[in-house]
Amino acid sequence: MSDFEMEDSASGYDSGDNSDAELQAAFERGDLKPGLNVEFNGQRDKVNDVTKLLAKTEAIKMQLPWLERLDMINTLAPLAPELAVQLEKHEQKRANLFKGNAKLPYIRPEEDPVLNDFKREMLFHRQAQSAVLEAIPRLHELGIKTRRPDDYFAEMAKSDEHMQKVRANLMAKQQGQAKSERIKQIREQRKMGKMLAKQTKVQREAEKKDMLDKLKKFRKGKLKNLDFLEDAKALESKQKQSAENRKKRNKKFGFGGKKKGLKRNTKSSSAGLDGDKSSRRQRGVKAGASVNKRLGKSRRIKAKGRK
């Protein structure tokens, strides 16, 4: 074993002997008791030295004018009548809640946390109100204005570029919501259209089946007339009439496609090759004029004299 290792082992033994000696001394003093292997120190006595505390407070206190501190020590403002009525109603409501419900444990009003929270908020409000009523006149005495002028222009903390980004973001959200609502409406319309088409198809199939059943009954002699066929014929004639009216309207007003420039002349129309319009046009005769040539003036005068 080297000399260094021997020195380390000797120092370890010495530290162990010292710790044992300290424990024995603590046991003799009564600091250690059976079952304890650590020295136990009793609680320190609390010292409330008011003089030193006030002196330390004055030492660290910043001597600034009241205008820089704005600290207030005041009493509570009087409770407004409407707030007193509201508090009373709230207490009555809580009492009725516990009275009419046997499942809830009864809580006295002074121990009710809900009422205590409400009262605490009222105390904060009254304290702030009293501070305002006392501080505003003091500020006026010091010549400090407490109201902004009507033409006051306050510079915004955010730049115009940032507000433009915010506006663009809000507009994008609004457009997205409008687009989403429009898509929902289209889906609902499609769904309703499919439902109506399905109902119409089912109704037609039911009518067809009913008519076939009546025909079978007529063939078997259970029905003596064919009145149901007259209703079908009337419906069919009505549908044909509506189809003819639709064709007439389409021929007169057109149906889809290009409308612009339809009344312009073409090569065939200007040459008089269009059906009805060219029938009245003849060479040397203006459109809309009579085909018979008018008599001359002298012949018209002679004709009048004969009468």
Swiss-Prot record:
Annotated protein name in UniProt: Probable rRNA-processing protein EBP2 homolog
Domain of life assignment: Eukaryota
Main location: nucleus
Residue ranges, compositional bias (Basic residues): 246-266, 294-307
TM regions (residue ranges): none
Single Gene Ontology MF annotation: RNA binding
Organism expressing this protein natively: Drosophila melanogaster
GO BP, one annotated term: ribosomal large subunit biogenesis
Biased composition (Basic and acidic residues): 236-245
Upper classification of the organism: Eukaryota, Metazoa, Ecdysozoa, Arthropoda, Hexapoda
Pfam families named in the record: Ebp2
Localization (cell): Nucleus, Nucleolus
Signal sequence coordinates: none
